[in-house]
């Protein structure tokens, strides 16, 4: 996991304060977690946060700078306006670099085109994994190579290779991907089976 700095300012609570911040290009945030007696209401520049997320994704180790002090943190939650799709609030969780944390990591699938070229249909059940590791070991994404799968094969959580120092929390027997036969092929197989049964009668 990369380490990226973002500056934040302390904010007053209340609707009027929130409106002023919005007019200045800020969105509300909050910092809480390890070693903190109480949470700190913050505000971050919307455009800077957007650029950070576009470049690094949500699984990024942050140096949240507040009044000259730096806090190691991760993005715990992002709230979005469901209609506009814009971020309206972000939670930063302060972490210890020496204690493991849980994080949700997206899966990046490779080899799908090869399966489809062989006539298979890739059916996804999981698009992300929950993992546990030290903050600086959490990957931004986990690459899953599907190129060796054949029609009828199933890939389970336990089959996915993760980086050293990373432990998967999800059920190892949970299905990630199944490779199905094309519907036409299934129907043809059923018709052939029916005809064979009739001939045997």
Swiss-Prot record:
GO molecular function list: 5S rRNA binding; structural constituent of ribosome
Record-level GO cellular component terms: cytosolic large ribosomal subunit
Biased segments, Acidic residues type: 185-194
Record keywords: Ribonucleoprotein, Ribosomal protein, RNA-binding, rRNA-binding
CDD domains: Ribosomal_L25_TL5_CTC
InterPro entries xref list: Rbsml_bL25/Gln-tRNA_synth_N (IPR020056), Ribosomal_bL25/Gln-tRNA_synth (IPR011035), Ribosomal_bL25_b-dom (IPR020057), Ribosomal_bL25_C (IPR037121), Ribosomal_bL25_long (IPR001021), Ribosomal_L25_dom (IPR029751), Ribosomal_uL5_bac-type (IPR020930)
A Pfam family of this chain: Ribosomal_L25p
Ranges for region Disordered: 181-201
Subunit structure: Part of the 50S ribosomal subunit; part of the 5S rRNA/L5/L18/L25 subcomplex. Contacts the 5S rRNA. Binds to the 5S rRNA independently of L5 and L18.
Stated role: This is one of the proteins that binds to the 5S RNA in the ribosome where it forms part of the central protuberance.
PANTHER family on file: RIBOSOMAL PROTEIN L25/GLN-TRNA SYNTHETASE, ANTI-CODON-BINDING DOMAIN-CONTAINING PROTEIN, RIBOSOMAL PROTEIN L25_GLN-TRNA SYNTHETASE, ANTI-CODON-BINDING DOMAIN-CONTAINING PROTEIN
Family: Belongs to the bacterial ribosomal protein bL25 family. CTC subfamily.
Name of the featured protein: Large ribosomal subunit protein bL25
């Amino acid at each position: 996991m990369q380490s990226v700095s973002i500056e934040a300012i302390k904010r007053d609570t209340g609707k009027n304060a929130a409106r002023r911040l919005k007019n200045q290009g800020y969105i509300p945030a909050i910092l809480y977690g390890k070693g903190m007696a109480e949470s700190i209401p913050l505000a971050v520049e919307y455009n800077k946060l957007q650029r950070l997320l576009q470049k690094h994704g949500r699984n990024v180790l942050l140096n949240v700078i507040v009044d000259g002090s730096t806090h190691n943190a991760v993005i715990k939650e992002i709230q979005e306006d469901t209609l506009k799709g814009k971020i309206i609030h972000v939670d930063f969780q302060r972490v210890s670099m020496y204690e493991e944390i849980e994080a949700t990591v997206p899966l990046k699938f490779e080899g799908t085109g090869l399966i489809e070229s062989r006539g298979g249909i890739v059916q996804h059940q999981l698009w992300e994994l929950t993992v546990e590791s030290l903050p600086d070991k959490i990957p931004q994404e986990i690459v899953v190579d599907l190129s060796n799968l054949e029609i009828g094969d199933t890939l389970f959580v336990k089959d996915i290779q993760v980086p050293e120092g990373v432990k998967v929390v999800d059920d190892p027997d949970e299905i990630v991907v199944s490779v199905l036969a094309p519907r036409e092929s299934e129907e043809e197989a059923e018709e052939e089976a029916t005809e064979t049964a009739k001939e045997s009668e």
